[in-house]
Amino acid sequence: MSNYLEFFKICGKLKTLKRTGWVNHGVELPESVSDHMYRMAMMGMCLDKKELIGEDGKEIDKMKIIKMALVHDLGESLVGDFTPHDKITKEEKYQLEKNAIIEITNTLSGEVGKEIFDLWQEYEDCKTNEALLVKDFDKFEMILQAYEYEKQPHQLENKIKLQSFFDSTRGKFHHPLFKSLALQLESDRK
């Protein structure tokens, strides 16, 4: 039987868990992990049929990308938000988050818990059109947030510090729309 209350409490932790990259770069009032996941889900929500085509020409499942965006960082509610600069290997990060997802999904009934775990695993494996697109959401949401921080009057001194976020994503987008949006955002920064 599902323990919905426990699951909802775990999800609630993401509302107050600040994104570590912004904290480490001295951003005032940094977004939460929940904020990040919400805008990613909205990215999936607003795409129309013509944009839901993968590199292989196959249709992308819209509902799946929305759900995947909502669960991709769920494990961080128990283990925290790691950055590439943390002293932890990718494999260690993966194992910590996998164990957290298992613990979290064990609070739900088998079918629902399995769906969440499978979505998370598909995102981590990054082999499907849906996972590749949600990875693009993840990267684009980050640089869009960096852009927004740079435009805030009290953050202007952070412009050089936030350049690394843009550098880390340059040339790494798969979907044509997000390749284009990333280039447009870079142009808007000038």
From Swiss-Prot:
Cofactor: Mn(2+); Co(2+); Mg(2+)
Binding site for a divalent metal cation 2: 76, 81
Cofactor, how bound (note): Binds 2 divalent metal cations. Shows activity with Mn(2+), Co(2+) and Mg(2+) but shows no activity with Zn(2+).
Sequence positions that bind a divalent metal cation 1: 36, 72-73, 138
Source superkingdom: Eukaryota
Keyword Magnesium carried by entry: yes
Reactions accelerated catalytically: a 2'-deoxyribonucleoside 5'-phosphate + H2O = a 2'-deoxyribonucleoside + phosphate
Principal EC category: hydrolase
One function term, GO molecular function aspect: metal ion binding
Keywords noted in UniProt: Cobalt, Hydrolase, Magnesium, Manganese, Metal-binding
InterPro entries listed in its UniProt record: HD/PDEase_dom, HD_domain, YfbR/HDDC2
EC number: 3.1.3.89
Residues of the HD domain: 33-143
Annotated S-S bridges: none
Keyword Hydrolase recorded: yes
Job of this protein: Catalyzes the dephosphorylation of the nucleoside 5'-monophosphates deoxyadenosine monophosphate (dAMP), deoxycytidine monophosphate (dCMP), deoxyguanosine monophosphate (dGMP) and deoxythymidine monophosphate (dTMP).
Similarity comment: Belongs to the HDDC2 family.
Subunit relationships: Homodimer.
Protein name per its UniProtKB record: 5'-deoxynucleotidase HDDC2
